[in-house]
Curated annotation (Swiss-Prot):
This is Putative zinc metalloprotease CT_072. It comes from the Bacteria. Keywords: Cell inner membrane, Cell membrane, Hydrolase, Membrane, Metal-binding, Metalloprotease, Protease, Transmembrane, Transmembrane helix, Zinc. GO terms for cellular component: plasma membrane. Belongs to the peptidase M50B family. It holds the Pfam family Peptidase_M50. One of its GO terms (biological process) is proteolysis. The keyword Transmembrane applies. It comes from Chlamydia trachomatis serovar D (strain ATCC VR-885 / DSM 19411 / UW-3/Cx). The chain crosses the membrane at residues 103-125, 558-580, 593-610.
Amino acid sequence: MTIIYFVLAALALGFLILIHELGHLLAAKAVGMSVESFSIGFGPALVRKKMGSVEYRIGAIPFGGYVRIKGMDRNDKDNSGDKEKTVYDIPEGFFSKSPWKRIFVLAAGPLANLLVAIFVFGILYFSGGRTKSFSEYTSIVGWVHPSLEQQGLHAGDQIFFCNGQPYSGHKMAFSSSLLERKLSLQGQHPAYFSESEAFSLEAPFNPNMEGVPCLGASYLLYRGSDPLPEKSPLVDAGLSEGDRLVWMDGLLVFSGAQVSQMLNEKQSFLRVERQGKVVFVRQARVLAGDLTLTPYFKNELIDCQYEAGLKGKWASLYTLPYIINGDGFVESKVKLLNDERVSLDYNLELGDKIVAVDGIPVMSNADILRLVQDHRVSLIFQRMSPEQLTVLEQKAADQAFINSYDMDDLLRVAESVGEEREVSRLGDYRLVTRVQPRPWAHIYSEALLDKQRALASKFRDEQERRYYLERIEAEKQRISLGIPLKDLAVQYNPDPWVLMEESVSDSLKTVKALGMGRVSPQWLSGPVGIVRILHTGWSVGIPEALAWIGLISVNLAVLNLLPIPVLDGGYILLCLWEILSRRRLNMRLVEKALVPFMILLVLFFVFLTLQDLSRVFVG
């Protein structure tokens, strides 16, 4: 099937080029220009056939195509052989027609691509659209960059507007911040546990320096078709296909990235009695050797270590950054030795009594010290009904997500964590406590990383190779639950004009980012890369392939309309100058100006092709 998809991808790209050049051809004939040749591809002709006055060709270099119209070359002459005549005097020639007619011919190619795009998007719309992951287009946030979290954006929030435009998903947040180096967001904190509340924030953000600003929310459904690894911490949890992870250590969870971040933050989940009420707190664990302990409290810690039955040096023990008495009451904070360089959130208050650590009841500070050496998580899973797992229209999916919780039952289960008699099951919710997460390498086979190592070792640049190999080794040590999760599918089917607007907008944003130096040309794809993208689209399904065909057709139109010499937009600019100046072009100067741009264009396509081939063979 791979070969079939490759052939379909190549045919799709060839079709888009054909349509573009056909637009030029038909427009030229419509205004009375004489067309000499029509070619798909450049270079030596692999196939050629003359029909009437036009020679039709397929070139050996598949970088595009061209329509050669009589009189476009300065060296063209009319049949009289009069050397004093210019290209403007050649009958049925390109320059013999008015500038407006020439603009019509030049714009006809991109216009043909836009018409194809709207036609393809129309087929996609009336066939029901595409099945996509909920996270891809949701307005609900699944994970937030720490710098934005400090500004008030949290996982579970719903964004309505991003930099003044209706929000269409996490990709929009990335592209907007890439162009404007800031994010201005308006939205709401949905009514999960309390009343919904509007929010607005504006913060500087540079993706080139900070990475991704946020990710979309996901349903975090257990993929029962993939058996749990034998060493998974949840292997005996009794999970079923479609069970949804909704809560972990006091927080609703909205994405795999959020879950991973929480697992690797080295925090303990505490049940605390505060002023007659029970509250839940996540507090960072720190090494005792990193704290400013007085000799008295150091001896107290050593005594506590002995009582807890912990071996090793006291400085290597994890502890909470507080002085905690024998009954579990917080007496004072303890600062870090290097608190000027490292910030630490203190979430406990003086007088708090710790009654449970990671869901396990405690009676003394020795119990607390013993339990904070490791981290066990408390999880709540939701049994999803068949109706809740039904594929929804994307427009209705966000509200369905917000309404998918039964907060009364969920709160009752969550609030029982750390009690002597926990509510292990209520309604659709089930509590799984004292789960011991493990490093990735402990759960999974090393063989799964061998392919990534092999790809990384192929990088020629030593620093780049070392960087990726180090990342792979670091990933091995990341703490994991060892559970395969999937997202809920939604039906994404905006009307054709919305897809057109988004495609044109994305293309123009890319051009703008390139011009401002905020996007590297290495992000772009040439003909080989486009074929690979289309190949992937066909392998996913016909709707996905149609979406990519429409998007690439729009990109071809936008690219060719750029005001760059040798492109359609460059020639249109010359025609407009001719109209405004009311003077004919000096073809000698025009050709001299075109040569360097032609060389740069060829070099650019060669660069893109080599880059595409590098992705194919190196990865």
